[in-house]
Curated annotation (Swiss-Prot):
The keyword Hydrolase belongs to this UniProt entry's keyword annotation: yes
Catalytic activity: (-)-trans-permethrin + H2O = (3-phenoxyphenyl)methanol + (1S,3R)-3-(2,2-dichlorovinyl)-2,2-dimethylcyclopropanecarboxylate + H(+); all-trans-retinyl hexadecanoate + H2O = all-trans-retinol + hexadecanoate + H(+)
A GO term for molecular function: trans-permethrin hydrolase activity
Active site: 227 (acyl-ester intermediate), 344 (charge relay system), 456 (charge relay system)
Native source species: Mus musculus (Mouse)
PANTHER family membership: CARBOXYLESTERASE (PTHR11559)
Entry protein name: Pyrethroid hydrolase Ces2a
């Protein structure tokens, strides 16, 4: 019945109810409130650039107690409940990290960083949902783990809102302890280490308990990350502590076998931290007690030494070395996307590691000394450096070619070969989709040397539709199509464990045909990525090293 034909008093009541409902809906749209198992949180509506839509953002939700005092170098504990409605409209503080590394990289890339504070109290997560999402929506969930060598990074460094809005997905971006506070280990019961990984487990457990309140499906969780974030994802696949906490995994330029991010022993880091801190090194319990008393500034001073810091085999999160766990097929059989970029060590990684000036000065004359040092860093006998020359440099005298081949060698060793190895192990238990991102991004090439192709991390901009710290992307029409395609692949995978759908170029599963997807403005299916290099690193080189050791042993006996 039309309102005009209702009795006067009933018309007033009906109109009042309509106005109330509109007010409540408008209020929820602008300042949505959601429950968690520890209390309520108020978010905000955030308009998504270059779209007509937006998301609800709930920022700085605690998933653990502040890891301070006795909780420094200790497993995370559940957060305390709060009364009233918690404000979730501002970014949380970043975990303690060497800020100078961020600033130097930012200057090189012409990035303007937002003013985000740092604190040891940093175990928070951000949630981005489509505006219609509410309890019962049952949307797929993606949990983003940032990269940064396990020493830098934050939940705010990547703007995930466009992916959430465009693809109707709930996205959670988490933080975890970094550097010494995140990964220092005494190698015994006093401080087993891997605190940052344990923080990630705590965040995934929080998601299982709470994500339904935000419209997410706890039984359809995909974890994804780049670089050290990809290494983290890969490590969760291997960890018994992460069982049942996720159902799909995406590893972008990072897996658990990355050489600088995993170690059998904590000895080197232990001695370095003990020396820098001035704490007694002979007694691990006393050392931890001493380190817990150090100020924020003293911890930051120690952190400055580490460009990267390795996780350790702690017997709990990682029961054995990742290589052993993969070889014995002791991992969670979940569908995976694994990928690398064409030029992994083209620019960003060497600069981050302080190798860019060394590479720029490589000539045929300086090459032997550089390779000898590099072999030592790779934990290879210095005598085998000539094998690296034969495989990558050959007889060329041209400095630019030598430098390019050196960068390729680094990229293969650090990223490509480990990714291929992990993919080959995992495909026996669950589907694996492999990619190589090949596109030279127009929006960043003007700040890089001309030799750089698809550099480490370039694919992330096309997954999220934004670069670091929401840097504006001025994409070409072809790049816009590539962005939409990659967002759709990632979202399809989050929905059903398969990136394919109608209208997209077919992405074959990685089987014994070794097919993979070449991601570019003209995508294509490739076969047997770097097969010769894989053979060199996994068979030829180890065999030659064994022969070298055998001949040295015989010589020693004589």
């Amino acid at each position: 019945m039309p309102l005009a034909r209702l009795p006067g008093w009933l018309c007033v009541v009906a109109c009042g109810l309509l106005l109330l409902l509109q007010h409540v809906h408008g209020q929820d749209s602008a300042s949505p409130i959601r429950n968690t198992h520890r209390g309520q949180v108020r978010g905000s509506f955030v308009h998504v650039k270059d779209t007509k839509s937006g998301v609800h953002a709930f920022l700085g939700i605690p998933f653990a107690k502040p890891p301070v005092g006795l909780l420094r170098f200790a497993p995370p504990e559940d957060p305390e409940p709060w009364s009233g409605v918690r404000d979730g409209t501002s970014q949380p503080a970043m975990c303690l990290q060497p800020d100078i590394m961020n600033l130097e990289d930012a200057k090189e890339m012409n990035l303007i960083l937002p003013p985000i504070s740092m604190s040891e109290d940093c175990l928070y997560l951000n949630i981005y949902t489509p505006t219609h999402a509410q309890e019962g929506s049952n949307l797929p969930v993606m949990v983003w783990i940032h990269g940064g060598g396990l020493v830098v990074g934050s939940a705010s460094m990547n703007d995930v809102s466009k992916l959430a809005a465009t693809e109707e997905i709930v996205i959670v971006a988490i933080q975890y302890r970094l550097g010494v506070l995140g990964f220092f280990s005494t190698g015994d019961q006093h401080a087993r280490g891997n605190w940052g990984y344990l923080d990630q487990v705590a965040a995934l457990r929080w998601v299982q308990k709470n994500i339904a309140y935000f419209g997410g499906n706890r039984d359809r969780v995909t974890i994804f990350g780049v670089s050290a974030g990809g290494t983290s994802v890969s490590s969760h696949i291997l960890s018994p502590m992460s069982k049942g906490l996720f159902h799909g995994a995406i590893m972008q330029s990072g897996v658990a076998l990355l050489p600088d991010l995993i170690s059998d022993t904590s000895e080197v880091v232990y001695k370095t931290v003990a020396n820098l801190s001035g704490c007694e090194a002979t007694d691990s319990e006393a050392l931890i007690h001493c380190l817990r008393a150090k100020s924020k500034q003293e911890i930051l001073a120690i952190n400055q030494v580490f460009k990267m810091i390795p996780a350790v085999v702690d017997g709990e999160f990682l029961p054995k070395h990742p290589q052993e766990l993969l070889t014995s097929m002791d991992f969670h059989p979940v569908p995976s996307i694994i990928g690398v970029n064409t030029d992994e060590c083209g620019w960003g990684v060497p600069m981050f590691m302080g190798l860019d000036h060394i590479i720029k000065n490589i000539t045929r004359e300086t090459l032997p000394a550089v390779l000898k040092n590099t072999a030592a860093r790779m934990m290879l006998p210095p005598e085998c450096s000539h094998l690296l020359v034969e495989e990558y440099m050959g007889d060329t005298e041209d400095p630019e070619t030598l430098q390019a081949q050196f960068r390729e060698m680094l990229g293969d060793f650090m990223f490509v070969i480990p990714a291929l190895q992990v993919a080959h192990f995992q495909r026996s238990q669950a589907p694996v989709y492999f990619y190589e991102f090949q596109h030279l991004s127009s929006f960043i090439k003007h700040v890089r040397p001309s030799h750089v192709k698809a550099d480490h991390g370039d694919d992330v901009a096309f997954v999220f539709g934004s670069y670091l710290w929401d840097m504006n992307l001025d994409l070409t029409e072809e790049e816009e199509l590539l962005k939409r395609m990659m967002m759709k692949y990632w979202a399809n995978f989050a929905r059903n464990g398969n990136p394919n759908s109608e209208g997209l170029p077919s992405w074959p599963v990685l089987d014994h045909d070794e097919q993979y997807l070449q991601l570019d403005t003209q995508p294509a299916v490739g076969r047997a990525l770097k097969a010769r290099r894989l053979q060199f690193w996994t068979k030829t080189l180890p065999q030659k090293i064994q022969e070298l050791k055998g001949s040295q042993d015989k010589h020693a006996e004589l």
